[in-house]
């Protein structure tokens, strides 16, 4: 004769196991949802900071030429323009230069909108890339006190490049090195297999790992407050990446404590 004894605790657990599993599932769902919500809030906060920084910098960039033009016009109003023609000419040239600067800034912002679409048509032709980059380097040597060197081992023309856009893309990288990098900037042009490789190297303090992927995002600037001492809207590197990709190439960033390298790979078409 056998006697069976049912443990009431075990029986209660069996009966409530479904409820326990559902409760655990609900708790897990709530926790995951909270983490997802926090991620969205953090992302929205970052976007808000980028937007505010962009608006602040655009305002600052536009205020400078507008203030210069206003000063020039006011000066012309307050002296005899007919008697002092040289001064009048100087103020008019100053105003014209600032108006041209405003036009370029507006064009740059509008052009950014076309990069993600098929509206941007590249006018490709045979290009002496070494000569092109040499002219860019010479221009920046005049504009900055930093040391910029150029080296190359290629002696051929690239058959299919849009000179205007490629020049702007490379200029953006050198301009970025001047603004954010150290005193030494190296521009190298080399042939690797079927590609022409262009590197822009500077000895600055580098870019933090968590910022490196985002520097190519549209309007993104490394968050350091309202850096009006550094000009720009945060579209230069984005523009460069899009233009290089439209040429079938790639652009990469490698940054350590004392070195930052931007590397462009262009196919030798």
Regions found by a protein language model. Name each.
Residues 183, 248-253:
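Conserved glycine-rich
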Residues 236, 240:
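Short alpha-helical Gxxx[C/S/T] motif in the catalytic ATP-binding
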Residues 97-102:
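Short alpha-helical segment of the dimerization/phosphotransfer core of two-component systems
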Residues 123-126, 147-157, 161, 192-193:
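Conserved catalytic submotifs in the C-terminal HATPase_c
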Residues 207-221:
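Short conserved segment of the HATPase_c
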Residues 184-194:
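Short beta-strand/loop element within the Bergerat-fold HATPase_c
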Residues 123-138:
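A conserved beta-strand-to-alpha-helix junction within the catalytic ATP-binding
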């Amino acid at each position: 004769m056998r006697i069976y004894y049912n443990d009431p605790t075990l029986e209660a657990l069996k009966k409530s196991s479904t409820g326990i599993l559902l409760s655990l599932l609900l708790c897990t769902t709530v926790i995951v949802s909270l983490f997802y919500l926090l991620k969205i809030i953090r992302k929205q906060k970052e976007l808000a900071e980028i937007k505010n920084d962009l608006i602040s910098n655009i305002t600052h960039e536009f205020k400078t030429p507008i203030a210069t033009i206003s000063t020039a016009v006011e000066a012309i109003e307050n002296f005899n323009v007919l008697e002092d023609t040289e001064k009048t000419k100087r103020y008019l040239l100053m105003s014209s230069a600032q108006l041209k600067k405003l036009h370029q800034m507006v064009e740059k912002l509008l052009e950014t909108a076309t990069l993600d679409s098929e509206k941007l048509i590249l006018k490709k032709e045979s290009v002496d890339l070494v000569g092109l980059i040499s002219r860019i380097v010479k221009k920046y040597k005049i504009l900055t006190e930093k040391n910029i060197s150029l080296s190359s081992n290629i002696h051929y023309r690239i058959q299919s490049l849009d000179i205007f856009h490629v020049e702007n893309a490379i200029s953006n990288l050198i301009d970025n090195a001047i603004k954010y990098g150290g005193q030494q900037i190296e521009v190298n042009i080399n042939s690797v297999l079927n590609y022409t490789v262009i590197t822009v190297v500077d000895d600055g303090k580098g870019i933090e790992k968590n910022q490196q992927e985002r520097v190519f995002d549209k309007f993104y600037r490394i968050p350091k407050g309202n850096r009006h001492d550094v000009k720009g809207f945060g579209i230069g590197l984005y523009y460069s990446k899009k233009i290089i990709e439209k040429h079938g190439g790639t652009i990469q960033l490698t940054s350590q404590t004392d070195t930052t390298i931007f590397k462009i790979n262009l196919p030798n078409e």
